[in-house]
Amino acid sequence: RGELIGVKSNKFFSDKPHGMVLIPSGSFTMGPSNPSVVLDQNPTLKTVSVKAFYMDETEITNSEYRQFVNWVRDSVVRNELAVAAYYKIGEETKEDDPLWDFMPVYNRAGDGEEKTAYQEYLEENGLGILDIENKSTYRLNWDVKIPWDRSDYLDANYAAVIEGGIGPDLLEDYEGFFIPADSTPNALRAFKTKRIKYNYRKFDSKNNKWSEYEEIEIYPDTTVWYKDFSYSYNEPMHNDYFWHDAYSEYPVVGVSWEQAKAFAHWRTFYKNQHQRKARKNIQLVSDYRLPTETEWEYAARGGLERAEYPWGGPYTYDDKGCFLANFKPERGDYIADQILYTAEAESYWPNDYGLYNMSGNVSEWTDSNYEKGANDFVAGLNPNIEGSEDNKFKVVRGGSWKDVAHFLKVSTRDYEKKDIKRSYIGFRTVQSYLGEDVGFQENPNKIF
């Protein structure tokens, strides 16, 4: 009737992501409860307000990060098979060719399926292939399985792409994806982890433009178990920690800040890809990302103002003398808390928000740049220091299995270069809560 009624839209309900808990909006006093001029990097106290967000209840585990690695590995292999198929088949359509299914085609019609006008247009202009040199313009076929067993190889051309060498119908010598058997221990078949690279780009909101594509090797550095400890026997951890099922639920380590950012980007892409396939016009999820330093401290406190540790008290043990976190209680004594290295990600009691190991186990990357005395100049609303690309140091929080109790305090700041990988640094991700979290109880995730 000529009234202003707004654009019709669906009612939006924020679904809690799997494995995450809601951290409600609130304010708190950021900084140490008992400032020490000698030890504290940020002795100034500052009251700040934080918008609600979801946070992983545990650190990202080896099992979860392996899902990322396997997806990237498969995409790299599919891409190489797609390129091989493109240049081998060219304009001659040979649907009976073993490599045909790996052709990068956008919405190719199946057998007996009536083509849409758009599919006809795509096929008329190059079989739906857009630009084989530009990965952003074509899609890989994820419906076809990759035969890994050598007895199941499709043909000699497929074998050449996977193992390396020249195929009978291929135009180039392929590098292959496996290390030669004579170069591996016990002639084991080992994938070339250097080839597992994730390509993505970010939107620069300050300059209002997309960044160039970044290519990042995402396999964890297992040699950190050697590098971090001189004259120390840690070979079993180097050999088994990331891939063995015994450590599946342990926090991933040996991951740089850049790799953690790539994981968060992939997690967003992976979820939204599922959302698009589920049904049309579905809302895409907010980006997964690393927490800011302020978000991390706010979540670690669990709603307890002025607490030194996530459990609230000033001590690292309970009334029975049991330690409340995985850390190094005494000089040279890593086992006093009954755990030598890392513990399972869901170990010890969670804090009042339901978050595990916000102190100890592994230190955690945050998104924030490190600046000494940051509390003196950051904003009071969702404070964060993004800084410039020249700042290579990122804030690390929480302390780890090899740290003394001081680093376990929720206010203690530490830092590391963003491209450095350590056997004691992991990460967890967050997702911004859309809308206001009104109507929730004070601690909606409290479990005891």
Describe these PLM feature segments.
Residues R1-I5, K11, P17-H18, F263, ...:
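Bacterial Sec-dependent N-terminal signal peptides
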Residues F13-I89, T93-A262, T268, G360:
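A short glycine-rich, aromatic-capped structural motif
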Residues N384-S388, D414-K421:
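Short proline/glycine-enriched turn/loop segments at secondary-structure junctions
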Residues S423-G439:
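Short, structured beta-strand segments at or near domain termini in extracellular proteins/domains
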Residues L22-I23, T29, N34, P147, ...:
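Functional-site microenvironments in short loops/helix caps that host divalent-cation chemistry
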Residues N10-K11, F448:
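Glycine/tyrosine- and acidic-biased, solvent-exposed loop/turn segments at the edges of beta-strands
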Residues K11-F12, L45, V252, Y334-I335, ...:
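Short Gly/Pro-enriched turn/cap motifs at secondary-structure boundaries
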Residues S9, D352, Y415-K417:
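Generic recognition of flexible, low-complexity loop/linker segments
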